[in-house]
Design a protein with these regions (language model features):
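Helix-to-beta-strand junctions that scaffold the AdoMet/dcAdoMet cofactor pocket
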Residues: 105-106, 119-121
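C-terminal helical/coil "lid" or tail adjacent to the Rossmann-like core of SAM-dependent
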Residues: 3-4, 177, 181-224
Length: 224
């Protein structure tokens, strides 16, 4: 998939709110090393740096456009284009932040234990994933994709996000690998100025798997 930092940042305040809440819950007073995986344009990395200004932080993302924006935003932090699923840090870390990225990576039954294993003893994995596949907007994406001239092109688009599990599944998965597991669910409400604004919001994230395979004329028809 291709990602646009400019599109993503049209709703920067709204997109950053969940990561502010997440980073505030990290139960560590002092952090020496941290990684922001799936850092996007650096807004989440900035929140992490504000919490731990003395830490050595790196940011990783699969999108060159996102990394370019992150480097411009935070030139003193090292950002790299990387495949999160294949990433191997040089040494164990105090904190791994994964904000709104793991839903795009399959195999959570092995991915999460592998991420925890990259931490120092007493380290923290702070992960946030959207739970919105049953929302009207996401159901409509799948319906429109399967009912139009683009159906063949988009037959796999809805599966771009990995299988969603319930909170207790993640608790049972993480518990053997961590002495403390804290899981919660929050609903964020974002008042937007009508249907077009909702489309603009979704073009930054959820619509990417549906728009990328289409020609420009098809994209306009799909969004209409």
């Amino acid at each position: 998939m291709t990602w646009s930092a400019a599109q993503y940042l049209k709703f920067e305040n709204e997109r950053t709110r969940p990561v502010r809440d997440l980073v505030a819950r990290i139960p560590l007073a002092h952090v020496e090393t941290a990684a922001d995986i799936g850092c996007g344009p650096g807004n989440s990395t900035e929140v992490l740096r504000q919490r731990y200004p003395e830490a050595h932080i790196i940011g990783l993302d699969s999108s060159p456009d996102m990394i370019q924006a992150a480097r411009k935003r935070l030139p003193d932090i090292g950002f790299e284009v990387a495949d999160i699923g294949q990433w191997r840090p040089k040494a164990p870390l105090d904190v791994i932040l994964a904000n709104a990225v793991l839903q795009w990576i399959p195999g959570h039954e092995t991915l999460l234990p592998a991420l925890i294993a990259k931490l120092k003893p007493g380290g923290a994995l702070a992960a946030q994933m959207p739970d919105n596949l049953d929302e009207p907007s996401h159901r409509l994406m799948a319906e429109v994709a399967s009912d139009g001239p683009w159906a063949a092109k988009l037959k796999d688009a809805a599966a771009a996000r990995t299988e969603r599990h319930l909170a207790d599944w993640y608790f049972r998965l993480a518990r053997p690998h961590a002495p403390h597991v804290d899981i919660w669910r929050t609903t964020y409400l974002h008042p937007l100025a009508g249907a077009r604004a909702i489309v603009e919001w979704l073009k930054g994230t959820g619509l990417r798997p549906f728009l990328d395979p289409l020609e420009e004329s098809e994209r306009q028809a799909f969004l209409a």
